[in-house]
A protein has these predicted regions:
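Short, solvent-exposed loop/turn segments at secondary-structure junctions
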Residues: 18-20, 98-103, 114, 139-141, ...
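Double-stranded beta-helix
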Residues: 139-196
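A short secondary-structure junction signal
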Residues: 105-111, 118-121, 143-150, 155-159, ...
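Non-heme Fe(II)-dependent double-stranded beta-helix
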Residues: 2-9, 15-121, 231
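Short, conserved beta-strand element in jelly-roll/cupin
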Residues: 119-143, 182-183, 211-215
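Extracellular structured ligand-interaction cores
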Residues: 93, 129-133, 141, 178-180, ...
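Active-site glycine-rich loop that binds ribose-phosphate moieties when present
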Residues: 113-122, 166-169, 173-174
Length: 251
């Protein structure tokens, strides 16, 4: 099944995808991770952090907590959405997004790939491979702002100057091409990591991002082995396909 909305716009949004009951246990595990992560990263957290990563590792969570997250990720309902975009899909990572401690800290337009690719490489990456964020809002939040279609096209001069903070522009400036997607707890937003986007701070922002990608070696290079399920855990998942694809490429 081809997801035509994603193909055209680079994202799609499902309101109320998860029930309060489905979120409750996951929220508890994520709070456990978040509390310990903050304690270990105080300076970073107090000065500029807006996200953490590798939630499924055994650094802060026990196996029971990790299994709960793996089950949440590998549910039939989520994987049906992922499979409409990626065939096959490989699990890549998890991230947690939250508000900066400093309420004056500004958000920033970016493409995920700009942090490890040159401008020419970024342009080439727009033709693949695809990486997607599956963002689950754990609380009501201002959401995210995206530039529709920018997963397949290069920046306009204004967009490029803004996300690179060049020629008098700043990465926090408003873009006329941006579209705000406000999110409430339980909403699901799937968007391309390659597109121009920015998180919007405020309220009790707390969002779990589950990243999937096409199984290309230079993308799966970023996967951490400690974030993957054991064989025993794998056997207890509804749809372990994305983990299985990743594990096959780790060998």
């Amino acid at each position: 099944m081809i997801n035509t909305q994603f193909e055209q716009h680079g994202f799609f949004y499902i309101k109320g995808f998860y029930t309060a009951r489905e979120l409750a246990q996951v929220h508890e595990v994520i709070n456990c991770f978040h509390t310990q992560w903050i304690a270990d990263n105080q300076q970073f957290y107090q000065t500029k952090a807006v996200n953490s990563a590798y939630l499924t590792a055994n650094t802060y969570l026990d196996d029971a907590q990790r299994l709960l997250l793996f089950k949440f990720i590998a549910s039939h309902k989520l994987m049906a959405q992922v499979d409409s975009i990626l065939d096959p899909a490989a699990f890549m990572n998890t991230q947690l997004f939250f508000n900066p401690v400093n309420p004056e800290q500004e958000n920033y337009w970016h493409r995920d790939m700009q942090y490890h690719l040159s401008l020419l490489e970024q342009q080439a990456a727009l033709s693949g491979p695809e990486v997607i964020h599956c963002r689950v809002a754990l609380e009501d939040e201002p959401g995210i702002e995206l530039v529709p279609g920018s997963h397949r096209r290069w920046d306009t001069p204004v967009e490029l100057a803004t996300r690179l903070s060049e020629n008098g522009h700043h990465s926090s400036d408003d873009l006329a091409s941006g579209q705000v997607i406000e999110m409430q707890a339980g909403d699901l937003l799937i968007f391309s990591a390659n597109m121009i986007h920015r998180g919007l701070y405020g309220k009790d922002r707390l969002a779990l991002d589950i990243l999937f990608c096409e199984p290309e070696p230079h993308v799966l290079h970023f996967v951490q082995d400690i974030c993957l399920p054991s064989a025993k855990m794998l056997s207890r998942l509804e749809d372990a396909s994305a983990f299985a694809v990743t594990l096959a490429h780790q060998e």
